[in-house]
């Protein structure tokens, strides 16, 4: 059990315990900072179906073999009820993180890209942190949340050149701005405190009240609006302090038998941020691997380098997609037997000092056989002050 892990569940008293084991091979991955690395940890969960209370306590141990470094972090989460979904969470410890905290490249994809193609796209830094979050629905359709986080950040270097292929190419450095810079760091070691408040508004939301909770019913005639304000203060260097406001609009609508229409607009603006740490820039979810395992077509780009358009100013991000379902394909003899769905999309970034970056996509979803339809394929063309490039994106859904 020490090596393989252990799980115990008491359904009568409604609690469970899990230990992942020292050989948690499902977490095994590779990057050029840590080399081979894996996770272990413990988790305890307790729940009450009658009033919606839920508590979890988790710990994660991550060890990088080339770095010879153990990182430990923990999290406490408690949901008070199923009526307004009020919750509080506390977390802290040491972790290794991508510069883009949305983590646009997964551990699995980065492992394959690095070991087989020497494309080490994942760029990482270290942080020790402590964080508290609280949120609740204040009235029907309006959810408010806030958090305060302390971070002590440190840049990292590559610690291995191990690969499964043999050629003369060298790995890029761990600097997202200067991939051929192996001697200096993209930022100086520093600490900072950040406070954030946000709200999510679901216009026209209806609900059903039950003794065991509130069931929300979203009205697809209206968009969902999210607003946020963030302030960074108490930094090692005053230049790292800034203010930021952001907004996200999400909308999805089924248009009769003509398919599903979806869009997402994201906008934001930094203030007093001329010399902030690159960690705090707005980073866009790019992709240079031609593989997407996250099913996040409204939150990512297909051919965009990961940090080419990062900004500490203003930005507008646009994603539009229409899935025709069977509306077109079902009208084409023979092809209708495939049960594929035609999809078209448009994606754009607007940031100062750059021409708009755009992607136009067309592809097929629901590719596979029987109940196993896990593949999506898109043909992508990118434009910025003219045609930039083209490629094929493979989307995997498991």
Label every model-predicted segment:
Residues 1-34, 41, 104-255, 343-345:
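Transmembrane beta-strand segments of outer-membrane beta-barrel domains in Gram-negative
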Residues 17-30, 46, 52-78, 90, ...:
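Transmembrane beta-strand segments that form the barrel wall of outer-membrane beta-barrel proteins
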Residues 48-55, 82-88, 141-144, 154, ...:
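Repeated loop/turn-to-beta-strand initiation elements of outer-membrane beta-barrel proteins
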Residues 71-74, 101-106, 156-163, 210-215, ...:
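Outer-membrane beta-barrel translocator domains and adjoining extracellular loop/strand segments
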Residues 59-63, 76, 88-96, 146-152, ...:
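Transmembrane beta-barrel strands of outer-membrane/channel proteins
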Residues 34-38, 68-72, 126-130, 189-195, ...:
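Residues that define the transmembrane beta-barrel architecture of outer-membrane proteins
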Residues 161, 168-190, 278-370:
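Outer membrane beta-barrel transmembrane domains
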Residues 87-108, 112-123, 184-185, 217, ...:
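C-terminal outer-membrane beta-barrel translocator/porin domains of Gram-negative envelope proteins
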């Amino acid at each position: 059990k020490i090596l393989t892990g252990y799980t115990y569940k008491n359904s009568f008293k409604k609690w469970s315990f899990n230990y992942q084991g020292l050989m948690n091979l499902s977490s095994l991955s590779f990057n050029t900072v840590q080399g081979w690395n894996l996770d272990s940890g413990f988790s305890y969960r307790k729940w009450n179906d009658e009033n919606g209370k839920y508590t979890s306590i988790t710990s994660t141990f991550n060890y990088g073999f080339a770095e010879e470094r153990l990182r430990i972090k923990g999290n406490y989460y408690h949901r008070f009820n199923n009526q307004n979904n009020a919750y509080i969470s506390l977390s802290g410890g040491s972790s290794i993180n991508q510069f883009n905290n949305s983590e646009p490249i997964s551990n699995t994809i980065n492992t394959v890209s690095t070991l087989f193609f020497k494309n080490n796209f994942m760029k990482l830094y270290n942080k020790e942190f402590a964080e508290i979050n609280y949120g609740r629905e204040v009235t029907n359709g309006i959810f408010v949340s806030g958090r305060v986080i302390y971070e002590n950040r440190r840049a990292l270097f590559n610690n291995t050149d191990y690969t499964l292929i043999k050629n003369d190419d060298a790995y890029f450095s761990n600097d997202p701005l200067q991939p051929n810079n192996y001697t200096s760091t993209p930022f100086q070691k520093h600490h900072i405190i950040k406070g954030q408040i946000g709200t999510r508004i679901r216009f026209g939301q209806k609900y059903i009240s039950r003794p065991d909770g509130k069931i929300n019913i979203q009205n697809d005639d209206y968009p969902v609006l999210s607003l946020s304000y963030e302030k960074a203060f108490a930094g090692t260097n005053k230049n790292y302090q800034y203010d930021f406001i952001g907004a996200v609009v999400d909308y999805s609508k089924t248009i009769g038998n003509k398919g599903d229409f979806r869009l997402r607009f994201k906008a934001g603006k930094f203030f007093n941020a001329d010399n902030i740490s690159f960690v705090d820039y707005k980073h866009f979810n790019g992709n240079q691997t031609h593989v997407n395992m996250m099913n996040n077509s409204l939150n990512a780009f297909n051919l965009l380098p990961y940090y080419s358009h990062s900004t500490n100013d203003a930005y507008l991000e646009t994603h539009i997609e229409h899935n025709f379902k069977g509306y077109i394909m079902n009208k084409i003899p023979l092809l209708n037997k495939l049960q594929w769905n035609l999809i078209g999309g448009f994606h754009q970034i607007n940031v100062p000092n750059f021409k708009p970056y755009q992607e136009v996509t067309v592809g097929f979803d629901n590719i596979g056989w029987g109940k196993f339809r896990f593949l999506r394929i898109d043909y992508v063309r990118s434009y910025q002050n003219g045609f930039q490039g083209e490629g094929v994106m493979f989307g995997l859904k498991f």
